[in-house]
Structure formats: structure tokens, C-alpha cells
Amino acid sequence: MSGNQYTEEVMEGVNWLKKHAENEAFSFVFKCDNVQLNGKDVRWNNYTKPIQNEELTSLIRGAQTAMDQTEEEEMDWESEVDSLAKKQVQTFDALIKKCLFEVFVSKNIEPNECVWFIQHEWGKDQGWHCHVLLHSKNLQQATGKWLRRQMNMYWSRWLVTLCSVNLTPTEKIKLREIAEDSEWVTILTYRHKQTKKDYVKMVHFGNMIAYYFLTKKKIVHMTKESGYFLSTDSGWKFNFMKYQDRQIVSTLYTEQMKPETVETTVTTAQETKRGRIQTKKEVSIKCTLRDLVSKRVTSPEDWMMLQPDSYIEMMAQPGGENLLKNTLEICTLTLARTKTAFELILEKADNTKLTNFDLANSRTCQIFRMHGWNWIKVCHAIACVLNRQGGKRNTVLFHGPASTGKSIIAQAIAQAVGNVGCYNAANVNFPFNDCTNKNLIWIEEAGNFGQQVNQFKAICSGQTIRIDQKGKGSKQIEPTPVIMTTNENITIVRIGCEERPEHTQPIRDRMLNIKLVCKLPGDFGLVDKEEWPLICAWLVKHGYESTMANYTHHWGKVPEWDENWAEPKIQEGINSPGCKDLETQAASNPQSQDQVLTPLTPDVVDLALEPWSTPDTPIAETANQQSNQLGVTHKDVQASPTWSEIEADLRAIFTSEQLEEDFRDDLD
């Protein structure tokens, strides 16, 4: 049917229910049991004592009008339902509304801010009872039990006031105690599986009315069937609505609120078992943990800076300090098991800066260039170790004199990783207490291993071992790359006053040996925190993957203790940045200037005036041929001019007579 075939009253009822369909409401039930006090029977319909209260009288009159208007001719209401029961229902309706109003006053809530629905029913077993749905934005789920106690108190007080049975003061007090102790006002609750406690259960206001209350029949024979007497609500939609219209409202609401598509899922027998209900605290901790892992939080200080709200929330809970510690431990464990140190560094790279990034001029590579090394090869080897691809050689060792750049490189790598554990030499019994669940172990200023040499060898080779922790049991250290700096020769192990040479070669087999001997100038500065992420991104972009297979493909073999980092040399073109630096250094060197002014011998004049050899062979091609033989690719070297092009440029500027005259002057 189309909407215009229904009455305006029906459509208003449907729209009102749809408006409050998803509003969460409390579900109360009022009842009045039959009791006996000192031989006096007090039945459910003995609460009609007249009282001089205009507000209560007005409410009773309104309920009477609603009941009279909704009576249908085919139902002989007057003959089947006695007038005493009818009058009692009207009185109860007024009392329940009075209780609601008194609760609103106690909570400083305006009545027009609340939505409520009341329906009086008769059950074969329960007898008379009344359902009350209450919704308000100012009422939270936690206040449900308090509301029940308040309504129970007001309900028992009004029942004693309107009881028509002649009771003594003591019996009135007893009646009120029975009403409160027996909970003549109840609220819908559910029992938690784990805590075994009852918690208030909220219902959807509109759905509950349409699917449950409006589908019930109107009571005709109190002794033969169950049904409803009267319904009232805050919107005045169902106070005067007939039974047939109520059925239409329920049907229309059900059709309009039906989902467009019905999703079907197939569950196994195991999945049919109801899972454990998670508490709000568990859900909050899981959400916090996901945020910490996504933001790579590995220390309490990082947590305070990046997630202060969740930190304060957990700290304020009972046992908050232990909760913080355990949550942070789960976060670091997740990072240590799912990410490598190289991956943590790589994800911090700013791709917008990678385009203009010059690897040769980075501070780390400047230190390597001072030693005449192939800086790409050194960075590639370090990246393989950080990615747990170094095999048994799981440790990067920076050693040499002071002020050569060992610590600033190690510090930059550790800061880029984030989840780093430090070796504590001062803690003799538990030196590796901070090294569990980490992506990198940093050993600063390592000395003689002594009694701990076997533990060092196991950790430096990437083995899984168990270590003792202070105040705890033993804990497992998974394969973790190590970065170590020292001024001493750590391959010499002394236990007491005795040297143990049998440990020298095993220690060397576990180290990526990088010996720095060139002292840095005082204004060299620190390595920028963005440098190593860009170095790793540069290596990946140019095909230097952090695997040992890729390393051997480029450099011919795996690194050794006495690895020659200067070979193969990087061949730079004339226009490359490296050559410009060399030219600048040569111009500022007095010795190189004296060599330029050295007189030329006569055979040099003839050599300069003759055509140069291999006129069609580019310099860059010759360099590339040499580099390809060594397994090195130079993608950043700019194209250099050929010898013939250089000769043509020189001869265009200087004639042969001018060149000969200049050379003669120098010889004289």
C-alpha cells in the first residue's frame, strides 16, 4: 500500500518510532504483589484510596480518558474487566508518571528532554505489571541501578499512601520494606560470563516498542488470557490509538526498517560457540597498542610525547605503572619480531629529499672518503648486517683512535632504528638486561670481554640465547644485529691476567671490521638524523638490496675481517662532484701548484702538438669498462667528453704557434 492510504495518526506514530529507533533506553518493570500482613490481605487492586492531590488527580483523569476512547464496541470491556481493576490501572499509571517526574527533579533533568513509553499489561502468571522505557541524553548506562533504587523508593512510598486497607503504622512500614526489599521495580540486566555480575542492558527505544509492545493484544478476559490495558507515551502518539492501528504501525515500521540486503555467512561448528565478551578496558588497551606500534613508540618518553592521553589514562588506573610497562613491552616485542633494523630505518626516509640527495657528500660517506674507501661498498655491507642478512657476521665494529667518527655514525644508526637496547658494562651480573625485544643492540666503548666472552660471541653471531635478568627469570634474545664502537683491540681476550688467543679468530669471524683512523676536524658536527634513512633509500633505489646475495653480486665476495674497503675504486668523471672537490683541494695545495709550474722538456712539446691517441673513445666508457669488470655500476657519474673533443677545444683556443711559444718560454 502507498503511504496516503493510512490515517494521519498511524503515519505520525511510525515517524515518531523511526525518529527514536536507535535511541538507547532503560527498560523498567513495575509490579505490585499480593501480600498478607497480620492476617490482612493486601491485593494488587487495593491501592485506590482517595487523596487530595490535584496533580495526581489530573493524571488519573487523563488515563481514564485514554482507556475510554480506545475501547472497541466488539469488546465488552465493562462486563469482562471489572471497574475496580480499570480504576486501579488508571491510578497506577498516574503513580508511575509521578515517580518518573520525581526522578527527573532529583537529577535536574527537564521532563521535555526525556522520551518515555508506558504500557500496563496483565499476565497469567505475573498478574498486573507495567513496562516503562526511558531515554534521555542526560542519563548514562552507569546510572541505571541508581534510577531503579530511586523509583523503587518512590513507588513503595506512594503505594503505602494510597493503600485502601486499614493498616497500622507498623504494618505500613512493613509493607514499604517488602516493596523495597522484594524489588517491586526492576531494570533489565545481563550477567557477565567472567565477572558473574549483573550489568544494566540498554534497549533500542523505537525497535522495542514496534517489535514487542505494539504486537500484543488488548486484554479482554483477565482470567483467560494476557494482554495490555493501556499505553501512554511522551509524544502522545499511542495514548488514544486503537488496537488495529497499533498493528498497522508495527507492520509499517518493520517493513521500512528492514535492511535492503541480507548478508549470509557460513560458520563452522567451532565458530558457532559464542566467543568471550571483551571488556571495555581490554578494547581500550588493544586500541592503544595498535596506535603505539603504528607510531613506533619504544620508550615511556616517546609515549608521553606522542600519545599523552592514553598514557595518562593508563597511569590513572589501579596498577597503572605495571600496565604501562607491560603494554610497552608488547609493543617492542611486536616491532622486534615483525621488523628488522633496516626496515625501521628505511620507512623514515623522506622521498621528497631523495631526488636531490648526494650520497658522496653525506657526513657518513665523507668520513669513509677520508680513508680512500668505496663508500657505497661500506654502506651496503652495513645495510646487510642491519637487515639480518650478514649471516654469522652479525656485528658492525667501528674501532680506531678517538675523534675519528665512530660514535657519531653508531649514534645516527641507533637513533634511526629507535628500538635499541644498550649493553651496560657497569652491571657485571646482568650486562644485557636492556637488550631483549630490540631491533638493534648498541655496545658503546667496548672493552675486554673477559668472563662474558661466550655470551658476546653468541650475541654477535646472531644466535638465539637466553640471558638472566635482574629480578626476573631468564629471557630469550632473538637474532639481533649489533653495532659496536671501541678504542681497544677487542679480539684480545684476557681472563684475569691470562690471554686467551683461542677467542681471537672466532671474534673476527663475527665482526664487520671498519677501522677509522682519520681524525675529524673540530667543526665536523654530528650526523643528521635524516641521513641514514636517506642512505638506505638511496641504496634500494640504485639496486643495492640489503641481502648478502646482492652484495656478492656487486662486490664479488662476502666481507671479511681484513676487507679492503678501498677496492674496487669508484671511477668519477671529470664533471663529477668528487673531481670538483679534488680540484679545489689541488688548487689550495702549494705543492700541487709548484708541480704545475715545473718546466716542460722538449719531448713534451712534441707530444702536446701531436694528435692524441684514441680520439673516439670516451673517458666515461673506459671508466665504465673498468668498473664493470669489478662489479660496480656508476649511475650517478655524468657523461665525460672524449679525448678528441678536449683536443678540439684546446686547439680552438690556442694555435700551434702560441702553444709552441709558450712551451719555449717555459723551457728557457
Curated annotation (Swiss-Prot):
GO terms for molecular function: ATP binding; ATP hydrolysis activity; DNA binding; endonuclease activity; helicase activity; metal ion binding. It is an enzyme of class 3 (hydrolase). Phosphorylated. GO terms for cellular component: host cell nucleus. Residues 1-277 are annotated as: DNA-binding. ATP binds at G400, P401, A402, S403, T404, G405, K406, S407. It catalyses: ATP + H2O = ADP + phosphate + H(+). A divalent metal cation binds at E121, H129, H131. Its EC number is 3.1.21.-, 3.6.4.12. A motif (RCR-3) lies at residues 212-216. Keywords: ATP-binding, Covalent protein-DNA linkage, DNA replication, DNA-binding, Endonuclease, G1/S host cell cycle checkpoint dysregulation by virus, Helicase, Host G2/M cell cycle arrest by virus, Host nucleus, Host-virus interaction, Hydrolase, Magnesium, Metal-binding, Modulation of host cell apoptosis by virus, Modulation of host cell cycle by virus, Nuclease, Nucleotide-binding, Transcription, Transcription regulation, Viral DNA replication, Viral genome packaging, Viral release from host cell. Its cofactor is Mg(2+). A motif (RCR-2) lies at residues 129-131. It is found in: Host nucleus. The active site is at Y212. Homooligomer; when bound to DNA. This is Initiator protein NS1.
